[in-house]
Amino acid sequence: KPTRFIKLQNLTDHLGGAQIYAKMVSDANGGAHKIYNAITHAMLCKRAKKKYICTDTGAGYNGKMFSMVAKKFGLGCKVFMGTRDIERQKPNCDAMKKNGAEIVPVNSGSKTLVDAVSECIRYWVSNCDKVHMGIGSLVGPNIFVKICGWSTAQISRELKVQLEEEFGEIPNKLKLINCVGGGSSAYGFWSEFIDCNKNKVELIGVEAGGPSNSKLHAAPLSKNSKIG
């Protein structure tokens, strides 16, 4: 079932000018877009005849979604998570445990997502004969980036249809605004529009930049950080 595409009428009236809409990806099963990627990986795991799946998580949503689909598909599930994130994401950690997943605390480095991804990959490389790995963001080896991107592109596949239903066509001067962290929701939101005329559709990413003129940031693309 497609997630809703709704007009934010009060915000539109308050700000004036632009017609403001929201794609309610939080309607997706489990409350986030991460479910699309998790389902894809669970199906791949079953196709490969493996009984275990591993993944990473930061805010906890990716781990929660993987634990949900692992339970549904009858798979064992390990979720690698930085200890700092475990401390501040208790509700999602509780959900993972209720679904039968094992949370593997990661104490190395910053004790957050980047280190959880690294530890997850290390574990998978040592156990790839019996374990399937799914990465929750657009990071890591190319094939995992492609799988995540294709899965979360369900957002823009739905949105394209909904825009045409609402306006009769893709409207001119359309601005698609999305947060940018690991990139899964941003790519998923933009995927179907990447090749559109840039005078017709503008893709706008909002990312954490940290304190002004500081090295305390996540290497934002706006500061010309390298990709790959």
Locate predicted features.
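A glycine-rich helix N-cap at a beta->alpha junction
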Residues: 74-113
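Glycine/charged-rich beta-loop-alpha catalytic/anionic-binding loops adjacent to active sites
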Residues: 17-28, 48-53, 136-144, 166-174
